[in-house]
Curated annotation (Swiss-Prot):
HAMAP family: RNApol_bact_RpoC2 (MF_01324). Pfam families: RNA_pol_Rpb1_4, RNA_pol_Rpb1_5. This is DNA-directed RNA polymerase subunit beta''. In plastids the minimal PEP RNA polymerase catalytic core is composed of four subunits: alpha, beta, beta', and beta''. When a (nuclear-encoded) sigma factor is associated with the core the holoenzyme is formed, which can initiate transcription. Residues 680-707, 738-767 have a biased composition (Acidic residues). Zn(2+) binds at C220, C296, C303, C306. Binds 1 Zn(2+) ion per subunit. The lineage of its organism: Eukaryota, Viridiplantae, Streptophyta, Embryophyta, Tracheophyta. PANTHER family: DNA-DIRECTED RNA POLYMERASE SUBUNIT BETA. Its cofactor is Zn(2+). One of its GO terms (molecular function) is DNA-directed RNA polymerase activity. It comes from Oryza nivara. Its EC number is 2.7.7.6. DNA-dependent RNA polymerase catalyzes the transcription of DNA into RNA using the four ribonucleoside triphosphates as substrates.
Amino acid sequence: MAERANLVFQNKEIDGTAMKRLISRLIDHFGMGYTSHILDQIKTLGFHQATTTSISLGIEDLLTIPSKGWLVQDAEQQSFLLEKHYYYGAVHAVEKLRQSVEIWYATSEYLKHEMNSNFRITDPSNPVYLMSFSGARGNASQVHQLVGMRGLMADPQGQMIDLPIQSNLREGLSLTEYIISCYGARKGVVDTAVRTADAGYLTRRLVEVVQHIIVRRRDCGTIQAISVSPQNGMTEKLFVQTLIGRVLANDIYIGSRCIATRNQDIGIGLVNRFITTFRAQPFRAQPIYIRTPFTCRSTSWICQLCYGRSSTHGDLVELGEAVGVIAGQSIGEPGTQLTLRTFHTGGVFTGGTADLVRSPSNGKIQFNGDLVHPTRTRHGQPAFLCYIDLHITIQSQDILHSVTIPSKSLILVQNDQYVESEQVIAEIRAGTSALHFKEKVQKHIYSESDGEMHWSTDVYHAPEYQYGNLRRLPKTSHLWILSVSMCRSSIASFSLHKDQDQMNTYSFSVDGRYIFGLSMADDEVRHRLLDTFGKKDREILDYSTPDRIMSNGHWNFVYPSILQNNFDLLAKKRRNRFAIPLQYHQEQEKEPISCFGISIEIPFMGVLRRNTIVAYFDDPRYKKDKKGSGIVKFRYRTLEDEYRTREKDSENEYGSPENEYRTREEECKTLEDEYRTREEEYETLEDEYGIPENEYETLEDEYGILEDEYRTREEESEDEYGSPENKYRPREDKYGTLEEDSEDEHGTLEEDSEEDSEDEYGNPEEDSVLKKGVLIEHRGTKEFSLKYQKEVDRFFFILQELHILPRSSSLKVLDNSIIGVDTQLTKNTRSRLGGLVRVKRKKSHTELKIFSGDIHFPEEADKILGGSLIPLEREKKDSKESKKRENWVYVQWKKILKSKEKYFVLVRPAVAYEMNEGRNLATLFPQDLLQEEGNLQLRLVNFISHENSKLTQRIYHTNSQFVRTCLVLNWEQEEKEEARASLVEIRANGLIRDFLRIGLIKSTISYTRKRYDSRSAGLILHNRLDRTNTNSFYSKAKIQSLSQHQEAIGTLLNRNKEYQSLMVLSASNCSRIGFFKNSKNPNGVKESNPRIPIPKFFGLFRNFSGLLGTIAPSISNFSSSYYLLTYNQILLKKHLLLDNLKQNFKVLQGLKHSLINENQRTSNFDSNIMLDPFQLNWHFLPHDSWEETSAKIHLGQFICENVCLFKSHIKKSGQIFIVNIDSFVIRAAKPYLATTGATVHGHYGEILYKGDRLVTFIYEKARSSDITQGLPKVEQIFEARSIDSLSPNLERRIEDWNERIPRILGGPWGFLIGAELTIAQSRISLVNKIQKVYRSQGVQIHNRHIEIIIRQVTSKVRVSEDGMSNVFSPGELIGLLRAERAGRALDESIYYRAILLGITRVSLNTQSFISEASFQETARVLAKAALRGRIDWLKGLKENVVLGGIIPVGTGFQKFVHRYPQDKNLYFEIQKKKLFASEMRDILFLHTELVSSDSDVTNNFYETSESPFTPFI
């Protein structure tokens, strides 16, 4: 008893680690036998004590935490604020997600800490508390889920679900929470991540790889080693774990004294000596070289010294031990623990966030303000940063609390502020934590409602790809979804139009857009609206042209139409154009469109180059019929250069023949292309269509224009059209004539038609007329006299249809057959014309042509003229009534088959169009336009918009324009490269004059606005920044400078008084000055001061379907000299206000698509987007707010909710839609904030439906360290798959090392050393990664087990093709050691590269085919082995088990080992090699020292750096 009394009583808790230490010390002191007796007594004692008290787990023991209620409430409040910010557009979706995750994670963690103290204080003997915190079962996270809250969940892909589970398992989950928690459940229906990585299967594969690894020798004689040094910041614990049980590869000296020799195993005593030495002399300490399984020279076994001590009895491993199977099971067995552990924790998210410090009580907070300086938190909220540890005191009524905040933390409250209990007062920054792997994640944002997309000017308007609708954001900006309610009816149920408004409206139909012109007085608008839609004979306008000009009796409106693929035209050219509707023609009432407009184009900044087209117009009389596609034929002179045959690029234009028209249509870049009905698309296909290049020359003889004449003005026309600003320049390089090829390429038609034209050239005097009979005869009379013509007199349109079909399509019609209209050609296509069918098969496709008309078989072949255009009946020469004659025919000469001399004549109807000869500048423009000044000249040029003899295809229900007239500008002064153009409107005594002033002197007005194109900016371009340079208009001198230059060409338009002035200018900051006197205002405003200049700014926005202009009203009774109003902003200052301003001030409001004039609002309304009255919010301005605030509101401005513009807040975010005197209307809109680099889906002004994708964010997030990733991660590494996005896939890294290292070293040695270094590098990296996963789970596995597996995974090399070898075939997988030995034996270098195989592939690439066959694919493996005649030497365990032999381990090892008699002499050989070994080591194997360490594992052995050779790269 006395002895027992003297013993020290250890009153400490003992855990697993302490037990391990105790047992190892007992074994050291007493040996194995005696220790087992002691442990039995401890076990008996434990069982006895455990059963004396019974702990039962009841539901009452699950105590919920009292503080949970207000903690959750606090988090909900923060989430609500965050949601509000998101709703206002202040934070974007990713930011909201991140903050939401942090709020709930911090709440959950705080609740977990509270749970611990709550148990400890209230019920320390609580069974749940005892069970989990003693480590017996479960952990804190599981108990937290039982009694705290489950918190945020991660789905199987590791993505966060941002809806937290607020309940715990004690309270029970709601249905939503249950479904979310199912995502975290393992082995459930939802989970897919773990199913593939079953622990048992992993163990099986691991054992399969290494089952043949047996300790067969004492020493393999290796001279390689791996260095371990604690100098790199390696922890002592890790250092000890690494060294214990290993064998030294070198003698170790301290000074000159040797303390350990080579091949000595390292025990705890030796390690302690190493540690004390390192502590004493940290800088002089040398690294310790140890042997590992990696360094063993054997191929299919391992030696005692490379393996080291056995884990079971602490001595060197015995010969015949199956260490491979032990290694496989050691790694596979904790996998079951990992799986079980993931099941218990259930996918609960664990992320790294900052710790929060909360106030212990209510009170006043105080700290030294000099020690902090203001900053912002990562979420943008204001905070203070403390550099050093900061002491904070909280003074409550009766107690003083003191809190110490560590350095680099954020203080979230101000000094002397009153704080409440549990309020967050500081945020502690987490220390330099381990490097978290980050991954790039895409987050899609979807529209929450139907609406129309708008964005600010910060978005690129050209899409990222040519045909795509994706745009990258160059900087952070807002997207707005304007509310609409979709409605198909064309009559508005709710209208914002006031009395006396003019409106144009049109509807959508299935196959195109129909636009109706309303020509009537104002008061008739209401009645005519209803019956416009009933008439069938309305003109169908071109769905794809950018602008249409229409008139309603007062104005010419410009209608941009919508086509999804052409609204970026302007953006691509980086030019800003605008069209001005200027003239109205009364004579043209009978035509479908009641006017034709002169469109004036002025490029961005108003700079005109030489030979620029400044204006053009399209005459509606020259519009193509709706009948279909066909050929335009004419004879030209002046524009011969521009419209030469364009054949060169026809072959390569053929991408996918079926979609030829559509895809080419999308490619057009400028507005002119649209006007010319996509001339390029059809011209370039000439070769393929089989219309001979010289066919149109037949017209030459008819019109009597000689060949040489028709080239006379080539250079001049090139001069006219060569301007880079202009699309109509000649393209000599692209479209040269190609006469030789056309004969060979195009088969029968071309040969025959060539004969035709020769035939016709032989009779140049004759013209042909078709009689009523079948024969065609020659007549000698000429209808036209030979005269010199500058322009084309007449052109013809001949119907023809072409189908380009895939090669594989089956035709339902025969070649040379006659078909009717609407005949089925293939399964999906029908003919639009009737007539002769010609089929031509090409390599890639089939062409099917349909020629309309009749077929005649002539009796005498020599009298027939092919390719002629013939009038059916005579007309007098002076007859001008009929501009369009449909009574011509076109005669074509065809051969039925190439081989037979059988001819027939195809007579095709043609439509003739006469050109207007008498038109000149005077007929188009007022007379004073011709007063040219200052060397500027204008020329009028007509041209035909189609290539001669080219097929023009019908597009939808379009009407193409055949003829366009252009106004071309030129000047003589050589030194002037460019002219400046601007538009001015002058009103004097009520007469309005519009001037287009073009001068050679640079204008004084500065153009500061950015470029805006067809879809750029919603209603008004700038919601935040006003980029107008208003200063240039503030002084009178600058205003008058507009008229300083005298080189005005003259007015473009004279109008009478009753036509109000309407100018639509571009957003390129053109201005106009209105001088007015005695103007009458409809509201009875008094006469304004005479000659007050009011600059008026306009914006033309080609929005979804119309124009927007805003106007400044006339303001009376101002004492100041002038008043500036830009973009309808109400900009009021107190000193400008007079008493009667409230009554007289009138702001005119404009709809989204509207034109506004001085006296009344004119709008056109897209009836397809009906505005719901409930989505428009009227916001009334208080009457007295005018004097108190100078806030600016303007039409089209986007306003976020709760912005305080006036006395009251804005109740809903949206766009200002109508501005009245005392109120304005907001169209409801939802803002979305999008960050730089985000991708916007969709087009500006596009209608989106609820759930459509709006934006895609790409952001980096720390990879959540969810426990589910334990086992799959290990399995991924073993299978050599990519495991994280930061370090590239190991296979790719090995490829890099394979390439770089031989290149650095050079020569045949490079491959040997390169493969060695690569394999060593990848092995160390892999071991570290696997250990990292296991250690994160608290599982300890000895490195040597992992090393044995990794050794097999990395032991193969692939023979490369660089050097041919007689032994191995290129691409063959061989063991590294085998490759080295073969190279030494053959005295020739074998070139090979290191390769990383996964464990499954290694199992199928062993020396034993019986082992492979028992693993997978048995039949295939055995068949291949039989064919190759493979021999299995039965060295492994599995082969012997399968065949029922004795396995070569344990007792069966003895007879196996006698095969090696040379084993005895091995030791002496090693001694002899020592000298050579030291030299070799210097050359080759000290590469391990190059390895840099990682901060996590921090020694050379545990390295994870990208490449050890970074300096060389």
